[in-house]
A protein has these predicted regions:
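Short alpha-helix
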Residues: 81-107
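A short, conserved alpha-helix within the catalytic core of class I
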Residues: 49-63
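Hydrophobic adenine-recognition pocket in adenosine-nucleotide-binding enzymes
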Residues: 46
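Conserved beta-strand signature within the Rossmann-like core of class I S-adenosyl-L-methionine
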Residues: 64-76
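Core SAM-dependent methyltransferase catalytic element
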Residues: 105-128
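Local beta-strand N-terminus motif with an aromatic residue
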Residues: 38-39
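A conserved beta-strand element that flanks and buttresses the S-adenosyl-L-methionine
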Residues: 42
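Class I SAM-dependent methyltransferase SAM/SAH-binding core
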Residues: 1-31
Length: 128
């Protein structure tokens, strides 16, 4: 297993990942290159934060036979979130003629009981 994150991690965190046989790469997702193929690619709350979401998704679908994705959608651009993600982008990145969808769920998640909410997309898909 491989983890990619641009943030600096504590030695304790690095040790936990190493103990689970996960090789950590400290780099931006756009800069990560691997000739390795993966059974699954997992992405959680990533694409809003990257500089090039198209490049990240191209790498993911090229490298993995199955993807599990959770991303916030329809949120306005702000500091730290240079993109507004839309369902239509995921439809382009994971076209139904190339992918089988075990889960394709778009919804609203309420947070903290204070009325805060966000729209999300959750996908579990495998290449045909």
């Amino acid at each position: 297993a491989v983890g990619v994150d641009p943030l600096t991690m504590s030695e304790e965190t690095k040790s936990k990942f190493a103990g689970a046989n996960i090789a950590l790469h400290q780099s931006k997702a756009e800069d990560f290159e691997s000739a390795q193929r993966f059974d699954e690619g997992w992405m959680y709350n990533c694409l809003q934060h990257v500089d090039e979401p198209n490049k990240v998704m191209a790498m993911l679908v090229r490298s993995a036979d199955c993807v599990r994705i959770f991303e916030w959608i329809d949120l306005p651009v702000c500091e730290g979130h240079p993109h507004t993600l839309r369902v239509e982008q995921f439809e382009q990145w994971l076209p139904s003629d190339e992918w089988n969808y075990a889960i394709w769920n778009v919804g609203e998640l309420r947070l903290n009981g204070n009325g805060a909410a966000g729209r999300y997309i959750a996908i579990h898909a495998s290449k045909k």
